[in-house]
From Swiss-Prot:
Domain J: 5-70
Organism annotation: Enterobacter sp. (strain 638)
Protein name per the record: Chaperone protein DnaJ
Zinc finger regions, CR-type: 137-215
Subcellular location: Cytoplasm
C-alpha cells in the first residue's frame, strides 16, 4: 500500500511555512494522541504518521529531499544501522517516548528530552531600603525558598553506597543516532533522557532528584550609593543544579522607599526649606537637615521663593565611584498666618511704605506684572 503524502497527512499545502506546519501538527497530535484514544489502534497508527510527517517537513534538508524524491528518499535501509541498540523499536516505528516529548514539549514549551544535568535556575529577591540605608550601605539578612543540593546523596540522586549507572542504551553519551534514508539523526537517549546515567536505587531523601526544597538565610551586603533599579548579583546562590550541575545565581533588586524630607535625582539630593518673608527680605541663617546632621544655610537678603542653594558634597557618593553629589535646598517663602492686631498694623504700615500693592521700588516683578496688565487692557479698548 502506497504511503500517504506528508503534506496531505498534515493538511497543509506544499508551499506551507514551518509555522503553518507546526500549527497543523499540534492540532492533529492532540486529536490523535494515544492518551486520548486508549486502545484505538487506528488513532495510534495515525499519530505515528503525523509524527513522521512533522519530523520530515520541519527539517530543511529532509524536506528538500522529500520534495525531490518523495518517500524513496527515506526507504534505503529504513531506520536500521545506527538504531537504539537493544531499545526494542522496529525498523519503521518511532520511539513513543520521543513522540510524547515532542508533542507536549512543543505545545507546552518543554522542548525535547533533557540534555545532561542542567544549571540551576536563577532567583530574584526584591529588597526595600530606606534612603539612609541606600546612601550609606547596609548588610541585611534575607530568607528565600529554593532548591538545594541534597545533603545525603550530595546531588547524585543515588542511594548512599550506590552510584548512578552508565546508561546501556547510549553508553553514557546521552545521545543516540538514528539512520533515516540518506540522513543520520542524533537525539536525546529515550532511556536516560539525555543524562547518560540511570539511577537504580534512588536516594531516600530526594527520591532521585538530587535536590530538596529548603528555605535558606543569606547575609546580603548592599554597597553604599545604590538606587532604585540597581541589581546585585550573588553568584551561585540560586537553585542548585540538577545532579551536581552548576547552581544558578540570586539577583537582589533594589527599591528605595520615599523619604519624608529628601528627594533623590542621580547622586544629588533635594529638599524644600521654608522661611518667613522677613528672612527672605533681610537675609539670615537657618538650620537645614542633611543625611549627616544639621548644618547652617546662609540666606542672602531679597531672596525669592524657588531659589536653589547648592551645598556641595552633601549628596550621595556614586556606587560606581567618582565625585559625591550635592544637596540642593529650594527656598519656599511662607505667608504669615495667625497674625495679631499689632502685627497686622505693622504690615499695613509696611505696605504703605512700599507705595501700595504694586510696590514700584520694592517689588520689581509686581510692578512689571501690573504694567503688563494695564497695557493689555489699554490695547483692548483702542
Amino acid at each position: 500500500m502506497a504511503k500517504q503524502d506528508f503534506y496531505e497527512i498534515l493538511g497543509v499545502p506544499k508551499t506551507a511555512e514551518e509555522r503553518e506546519i507546526k500549527k497543523a501538527y499540534k492540532r492533529l497530535a492532540m486529536k490523535f494522541h494515544p492518551d486520548r484514544n486508549q486502545g484505538d489502534k487506528e488513532a495510534e497508527a495515525k499519530f505515528k504518521e503525523i509524527k513522521e510527517a512533522y519530523e520530515i517537513l520541519t527539517d530543511a534538508q529532509k524536506r528538500a529531499a522529500y520534495d525531490q524524491y518523495g518517500h524513496a528518499a527515506f526507504e534505503q535501509g529504513g531506520m536500521g544501522g545506527g538504531g537504539y541498540g537493544g531499545g526494542g523499536f522496529g525498523g519503521g516505528g518511532a520511539d513513543f517516548g520521543d513522540i510524547f516529548g515532542d508533542v507536549f514539549g512543543d505545545i507546552f514549551g518543554g522542548g525535547r528530552g533533557r540534555q545532561r544535568a542542567s544549571r540551576g535556575a536563577d532567583l530574584r529577591y526584591n529588597m526595600e531600603l530606606t534612603l539612609e540605608e541606600a546612601v550609606r550601605g547596609v548588610t541585611k539578612e534575607i530568607r528565600i525558598p529554593t532548591l538545594e543540593e541534597c545533603d545525603i546523596c550530595h546531588g547524585s540522586g543515588a542511594k548512599v553506597g550506590t552510584k548512578p549507572q552508565t546508561c546501556p542504551t547510549c553508553h553514557g553519551s546521552g545521545q543516540v543516532q538514528i539512520r533515516q534514508g540518506f540522513f543520520a539523526v542524533q537525539q536525546a537517549c529515550p532511556h536516560c533522557h539525555g543524562r547518560g546515567t540511570l539511577i537504580k536505587d534512588p536516594c531516600n531523601k530526594c527520591h532521585g532528584h538530587g535536590r530538596v526544597e529548603k528555605t535558606k538565610t543569606l547575609s546580603v551586603k548592599i554597597p553604599a550609593g545604590v538606587d532604585t533599579g540597581d541589581r546585585i548579583r550573588l553568584a551561585g546562590e540560586g537553585e542548585a543544579g540538577e545532579h551536581g550541575a552548576q547552581a544558578g545565581d540570586l539577583y537582589v533588586q533594589v527599591q528605595v522607599k520615599q523619604h519624608a524630607i529628601f528627594e533623590r535625582e542621580g547622586n544629588n539630593l533635594y529638599c524644600e526649606v521654608p522661611i518667613n518673608f522677613a528672612m527672605a527680605a533681610l537675609g539670615g541663617e537657618i538650620e537645614v537637615p542633611t543625611l549627616d546632621g544639621r548644618v547652617n544655610l546662609k540666606v542672602p537678603g531679597e531672596t525669592q521663593t524657588g531659589k536653589l542653594f547648592r551645598m556641595r558634597g552633601r549628596g550621595v557618593k556614586s556606587v560606581r565611584g567618582g565625585a559625591q553629589g550635592d544637596l540642593l535646598c529650594r527656598v519656599v517663602v511662607e505667608t504669615p498666618v495667625g497674625l495679631n492686631d499689632k502685627q497686622k498694623q505693622l504690615l499695613k504700615e509696611l505696605q504703605e511704605s512700599f507705595g501700595g500693592p504694586t510696590g514700584e521700588n520694592n517689588s520689581p516683578r509686581s510692578k512689571s506684572f501690573f504694567d503688563g496688565v494695564k497695557k493689555f487692557f489699554d490695547d483692548l479698548t483702542r
